[in-house]
Each structure stands twice: as C-alpha cells, then as structure tokens.
Amino acid sequence: MKILVIDDDPSVRKFIATTLKNENHTVTEAENGVEGLKKFQEERDINIIITDLIMPDKEGLETIIEIRKINPSIKILAISGGGKVGPENFLLLADAVGANATLKKPFSGQELLMCLKLLE
C-alpha cells in the first residue's frame, strides 16, 4: 500500500515511515497539512493517509476536511498527542470531520499496524 504520513515532528514521521517500510508499504512524507495536501493531489495512488492533528500552517482537522472534498473514500488515520485540551478531544473532532480511525500518541509500531489493518 502507498501511505502518506503528515506530521510536523520529524522523529514521529521517521518512526511511522520506518514501521511501515518494514512491512513493505510505500511511504510519502509531509511535514504539515499544506505540504500533505499538495502531495495527495500530486500522487493519486495513495491508499491511506496518516495525519497529525496539531501542526503549523494547516492543522490536521482542516487537512482532513479538504482531503474529504477531493476524495470522500480515502482512508484516514488521525493521530494526536493532544496539546492544551488533551488528545481525546482532538481525536473526537477528527472522527467528526471524517477520520476513519484515530490513535493517541505515543503509540507502538504494533498499535499503528493494527489500526492500519482495520482500515484495509
């Protein structure tokens, strides 16, 4: 599968990308929602999007809404470590705007792969 990973934290992106590549997935990375949306529009063969919710330039919720306008059926996994209001609140909002699944940071590689398996 081809998976787009959108997260402003390079260490989180690297962890996710390495986990996915070890399972023979193809990974495209973006450091914010603006870049992620651009890559999604350019690379039409993406199967799943994993996006952080709190990022500079364009937050994950806005990114999810815009992606849904382009492709209502693409699978989206929203991830969040929270911020001031706590990750649970952000993840509920992600669900409300169209994420197919949510995962609270920090998470293990095994938890990530289990979530992706549910999206397949």
Each model region followed by its residue ranges:
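Active-site residues of response regulator receiver
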Residues: D52
